[in-house]
Amino acid sequence: MSISGITNTALSGMRAQTMRIGAIANNVANSSTPDYARLNTSLTAAASGGVQATVSPTASDVDPATELTDLIEAEQANKANAVVFETGADMWEMLMSIKRD
Protein backbone atom coordinates (compact mmCIF):
# COMPACT_ATOMS: atom_id res chain seq x y z
CA MET A 1 0.00 0.00 0.00
CA SER A 2 1.25 3.48 -0.85
CA ILE A 3 1.69 6.24 1.69
CA SER A 4 -1.26 8.12 0.18
CA GLY A 5 -3.29 4.91 0.48
CA ILE A 6 -2.38 4.69 4.16
CA THR A 7 -3.40 8.28 4.85
CA ASN A 8 -6.59 7.98 2.78
CA THR A 9 -7.58 4.84 4.68
CA ALA A 10 -6.99 6.62 7.99
CA LEU A 11 -8.99 9.64 6.82
CA SER A 12 -11.92 7.46 5.77
CA GLY A 13 -11.83 5.83 9.20
CA MET A 14 -11.90 9.23 10.90
CA ARG A 15 -14.82 10.35 8.71
CA ALA A 16 -16.72 7.15 9.52
CA GLN A 17 -16.14 7.55 13.26
CA THR A 18 -17.23 11.19 13.05
CA MET A 19 -20.52 10.05 11.50
CA ARG A 20 -20.85 7.45 14.25
CA ILE A 21 -20.25 10.05 16.97
CA GLY A 22 -22.88 12.29 15.35
CA ALA A 23 -25.42 9.46 15.43
CA ILE A 24 -24.61 8.79 19.10
CA ALA A 25 -25.07 12.49 19.90
CA ASN A 26 -28.47 12.45 18.18
CA ASN A 27 -29.47 9.36 20.14
CA VAL A 28 -28.56 10.92 23.48
CA ALA A 29 -30.16 14.27 22.62
CA ASN A 30 -33.41 12.61 21.53
CA SER A 31 -33.54 9.82 24.11
CA SER A 32 -36.68 11.26 25.71
CA THR A 33 -38.37 12.23 22.43
CA PRO A 34 -41.51 10.14 21.88
CA ASP A 35 -41.33 7.74 18.92
CA TYR A 36 -37.64 8.54 18.31
CA ALA A 37 -35.92 5.78 16.35
CA ARG A 38 -32.37 5.15 17.58
CA LEU A 39 -29.72 5.68 14.89
CA ASN A 40 -27.28 2.85 14.29
CA THR A 41 -24.03 3.23 12.36
CA SER A 42 -22.80 0.32 10.25
CA LEU A 43 -19.17 0.30 9.16
CA THR A 44 -18.18 -1.62 6.03
CA ALA A 45 -15.09 -1.89 3.89
CA ALA A 46 -15.21 0.60 1.02
CA ALA A 47 -14.54 -0.67 -2.49
CA SER A 48 -11.74 1.88 -2.90
CA GLY A 49 -10.19 0.91 0.45
CA GLY A 50 -10.87 2.35 3.85
CA VAL A 51 -14.19 2.39 5.65
CA GLN A 52 -17.69 3.48 4.75
CA ALA A 53 -20.27 4.45 7.38
CA THR A 54 -24.02 4.10 6.93
CA VAL A 55 -26.40 5.57 9.49
CA SER A 56 -29.90 4.11 9.69
CA PRO A 57 -32.77 4.15 12.20
CA THR A 58 -33.48 1.04 14.26
CA ALA A 59 -36.46 -0.13 16.25
CA SER A 60 -34.61 -0.36 19.55
CA ASP A 61 -34.82 2.22 22.32
CA VAL A 62 -31.91 4.45 23.31
CA ASP A 63 -29.89 2.95 26.18
CA PRO A 64 -27.48 5.47 27.77
CA ALA A 65 -25.00 2.73 28.72
CA THR A 66 -24.89 1.44 25.13
CA GLU A 67 -24.45 4.97 23.79
CA LEU A 68 -21.59 5.66 26.22
CA THR A 69 -19.88 2.39 25.30
CA ASP A 70 -20.28 3.15 21.59
CA LEU A 71 -18.91 6.66 22.12
CA ILE A 72 -15.80 5.38 23.91
CA GLU A 73 -15.25 2.82 21.15
CA ALA A 74 -15.64 5.48 18.43
CA GLU A 75 -13.23 7.84 20.20
CA GLN A 76 -10.60 5.11 20.51
CA ALA A 77 -10.98 4.18 16.84
CA ASN A 78 -10.67 7.85 15.90
CA LYS A 79 -7.46 8.16 17.92
CA ALA A 80 -6.03 5.04 16.27
CA ASN A 81 -6.84 6.41 12.81
CA ALA A 82 -5.19 9.72 13.72
CA VAL A 83 -2.01 7.88 14.73
CA VAL A 84 -1.99 5.95 11.44
CA PHE A 85 -2.50 9.19 9.50
CA GLU A 86 0.29 10.91 11.44
CA THR A 87 2.65 7.99 10.80
CA GLY A 88 1.88 8.10 7.07
CA ALA A 89 2.50 11.85 7.00
CA ASP A 90 5.80 11.40 8.87
CA MET A 91 6.88 8.72 6.38
CA TRP A 92 6.03 11.06 3.51
CA GLU A 93 8.09 13.88 5.06
CA MET A 94 11.02 11.52 5.58
CA LEU A 95 10.91 10.38 1.95
CA MET A 96 10.75 13.97 0.74
CA SER A 97 13.76 14.95 2.86
CA ILE A 98 15.74 11.98 1.48
CA LYS A 99 14.77 12.97 -2.05
CA ARG A 100 15.96 16.57 -1.48
CA ASP A 101 19.35 15.43 -0.15
Indicate where each model-derived feature is located.
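Amphipathic alpha-helical polymerization modules
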Residues: 1-101
